[in-house]
Amino acid sequence: MKTTQLIATVLTCSFLYIQPARAQFVVSDPATEAETLATALATAENLTQTIAMVTMLTSAYGVTGLLTSLNQKNQYPSTKDLDNEMFSPRMPMSTTARAITSDTDRAVVGSDAEADLLRSQITGSANSAGIAADNLETMDKRLTANADTSAQLSRSRNIMQATVTNGLLLKQIHDAMIQNVQATNLLTMATAQAGLHEAEEAAAQRKEHQKTAVIFGALP
């Protein structure tokens, strides 16, 4: 009997010691763990997108090289320079103009009024031709630049690069439209220049006729 009571007492004590130990095991909930993992992955993805956006916005939109060609050089003379270049020219204003005026077939000998008029007319026409030649060269360069810009647009890695490149293309188109109007006006001015040359020649001939008439006493 005593032996039975002793065994019962030992078993009871053993259960008392084991019970707290069971409470130390971690209770695992698969559903909760899956939800926590999904939240962590979503947070990491948002962080990656944020970093990518910051990098994109701080990289000059990836078109720094294109922005250097944003402003196309204007080869047309300004309004204040028209008289000096086309209508009352004193010297050739470009390489093309200098080549035209230096041709021996256009050399004018003498320092009389008629010689000065001819030199002025030749120089003015040469400057007009030089302006047109320079603009043709500029258009060739622009065509090449536009091809590079289109290639850049196709290589755009994000919407910001594509937007800026499209803006550059629109700027170039706008510049071309303006220069097309300028070219039309230049043609009008060249036509006026040719008419003015004829009037100047007629005026010079009239002066010579008047001088001759004075010599022979034909004028009152």
Curated annotation (Swiss-Prot):
Protein's UniProt keywords contain Signal: yes
Signal peptide stretch: 1-23
Keyword tags: Crown gall tumor, Plasmid, Signal
Record family assignment: Belongs to the virb5 family.
Xref: NCBIfam families: PRK13860.1
Function: VirB proteins are suggested to act at the bacterial surface and there play an important role in directing T-DNA transfer to plant cells.
Protein name according to UniProt: Protein virB5
Organism: Rhizobium radiobacter
Gene this protein is translated from: virB5
